[in-house]
């Protein structure tokens, strides 16, 4: 069962705009008994792997979050949402699963739209380990901007998923 925790990231130290506050307030409204945890430079190790450290130094915080969200859900369990995701109904029904993810469209999974899992599921370790083999800054100085939808989708293709946008149970 997925624990009642909502994780989000806010790197860079800037003030949260009203649109972000509106989304976070929707989480509080529809998930009032959930622990909402903000992760940032003070409680997340941005030096945990080269990809994360390089993305952070380049101020490409969305790419830091792509990896960090996997790490905290793997370690603590719970739900992750980007700060532009507004909740419009309670999420309690999703907690009965060991994990869930959402489709961005019929061809791509998008962890930023929200996903949840019990702590310690092997799939998320595999997903994290994929990033351990990469640098964010390529040898020619360009950025490795492979987003989380492609990484998650490519990995899930090896786990019995059908790219049709349907609700499905993925084999263990």
Please identify what each model-predicted range represents.
Residues 1-65, 81-172:
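Glycosyltransferase-associated regions of secretory-pathway enzymes
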Residues 66-78:
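Small-residue hinge/turn detector
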């Amino acid at each position: 069962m997925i624990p009642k925790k909502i994780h989000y990231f806010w790197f860079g130290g800037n003030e949260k705009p009203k649109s972000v506050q509106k989304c976070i307030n929707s989480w509080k409204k529809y998930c009032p008994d959930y622990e909402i945890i903000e992760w940032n430079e003070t409680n997340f190790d941005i030096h945990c792997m080269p990809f994360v450290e390089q993305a952070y130094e380049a101020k490409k915080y969305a790419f830091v979050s792509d990896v960090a969200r996997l790490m905290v859900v793997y370690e603590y369990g719970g739900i992750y949402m980007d700060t532009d995701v507004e909740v419009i109904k309670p999420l309690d029904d999703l907690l009965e699963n060991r994990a869930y993810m959402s489709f961005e469209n019929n061809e791509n999974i998008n962890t930023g739209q929200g996903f949840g899992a019990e702590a310690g599921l092997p799939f998320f370790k595999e997903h994290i380990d994929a990033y351990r083999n990469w640098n964010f800054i390529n040898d020619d100085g360009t950025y490795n901007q492979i987003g989380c939808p492609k990484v998650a989708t490519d990995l899930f293709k090896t786990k019995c998923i059908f790219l049709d946008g349907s609700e499905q149970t993925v084999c263990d």
